[in-house]
Design a protein with these regions (language model features):
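Soluble catalytic domains of membrane acyltransferases
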Residues: 1-171
Length: 173
């Protein structure tokens, strides 16, 4: 069962584009703060939606290599987004981040990324300083009957929550 007395960060392997976060958000019992690729926030058609949903942009290395922004700008954008997501989680919201995976046609494991863990630890520090419950990490499995087909059956599997404990959060940051 998903904890309802604290914020949580859902972490899944990303295989199916924009469908994955939607499937998780619709099957979750909390309101969400959203993080997403920086180029989703800047694309003409998608940006209209992502701005209205207050999606926090995350600049990836691939976007830096394409020249989407400078390294200094990326550091500022990512730092601000991490703080916004962590603050939302610390106040009891849900969040979903996809640290691994590629498109459904090339679904293979990639090098592990640390962003989700850094986000939930920052959320834990904020929650601890405000006297709120420490957040949990929720591992998620996304399963599709036939992932190549549009409108295929999907199953969202929530793993047991990985609860942060007081010892995980230093007293001074």
């Amino acid at each position: 069962t998903l904890p309802t007395d604290r914020g949580n960060l859902c972490c899944a392997w990303h295989t199916n584009g924009l469908i994955d976060p939607l499937a998780i958000a619709l099957n979750h019992n909390r309101f969400f703060v959203l993080g997403g690729r920086h180029d989703l926030v800047t694309r003409p058609l998608l940006s209209w939606w992502t701005r209205r949903m207050a999606v926090q942009p995350v600049v990836r290395k691939a976007e830096l290599l394409r020249g989407g922004c400078s390294e200094e700008e990326a550091t500022q954008i990512n730092g601000r987004s991490l703080l916004m997501l962590a603050t939302g989680i610390s106040e009891g919201f849900g969040c979903v981040l996809f640290p691994e995976g590629t498109s459904h046609s090339e679904s293979s494991m990639l090098r592990f990324r640390t962003g989700p863990m850094r986000t939930v630890l920052a959320a834990g520090a904020i929650a601890k300083s405000r006297g709120n419950e420490l957040p949990a990490v929720i591992p998620i499995g996304l399963h599709f009957r036939n992932r190549e087909l549009f409108r295929t059956d999907e199953w969202v599997e929530y793993g047991p929550p990985l609860q942060l404990v007081d010892d995980d959060i230093p007293d001074e940051l």
